[in-house]
Amino acid sequence: MRVGVYPGSFDPITKGHLDLIERAASKFDKVIVAVLININKKGMFSIEERVNLIEKCVAKYNNVEVKSFNGLLIDFVRKEKADVIIKGLRSVTDFEYEFQMALMNRELANEVETVFMVTSPNYSYISSSAIKQVASFNGEIKNFVPKEIVEDLEERISSLRGEG
């Protein structure tokens, strides 16, 4: 069984992330969306909330699971008995960073491959950071995030502004 792990912070999950998950689900027997717990970074959503939001978006896929992890990605990959780390690439800048990480992961566990998937052109400009910035200035975000979580994101932005 081919198991791929797609790691990230997903704060929030974007249409670009979801597109990659959908494409990976068609290539692997099982895809684990691995939500990174970064204690040094205050997210818009808690880890539990992010896991729940992603689960709402991927509910229709029988071969996609969502889990959180902390520590080394490679340790999580081994624990889940996965073969592959799945990484999305939007730009050359993404590639430079992800290439270095792939080499480091190969050094730590040469049995695990990293597969790079190029982001669909219509999502290549979308990032969680950009979405948060647009939302913080009352901009329209529904074109950037999966429809399943638009309301959740709008409610969170309102509460952060003190409107809710």
UniProtKB/Swiss-Prot annotation:
One GO CC term on file: cytoplasm
GO biological process, any: coenzyme A biosynthetic process
Catalytic activity, as annotated: (R)-4'-phosphopantetheine + ATP + H(+) = 3'-dephospho-CoA + diphosphate
The protein's Enzyme Commission number: 2.7.7.3
Feature type site, description Transition state stabilizer: 17
Residues bound to ATP: 9-10, 17, 88-90, 98, 123-129
UniProt GO molecular function: ATP binding; pantetheine-phosphate adenylyltransferase activity
Top-rank taxon, per record: Bacteria
Coiled coil location: none
Pfam family, any one: CTP_transf_like
Binding site for substrate: 9, 41, 73, 87
Gene3D superfamilies: HUPs
Subunit annotation: Homohexamer.
Record-given protein name: Phosphopantetheine adenylyltransferase
Protein species of origin: Clostridium perfringens (strain ATCC 13124 / DSM 756 / JCM 1290 / NCIMB 6125 / NCTC 8237 / Type A)
Lineage of producing organism: Bacteria, Bacillati, Bacillota, Clostridia, Eubacteriales
Gene for this chain: coaD
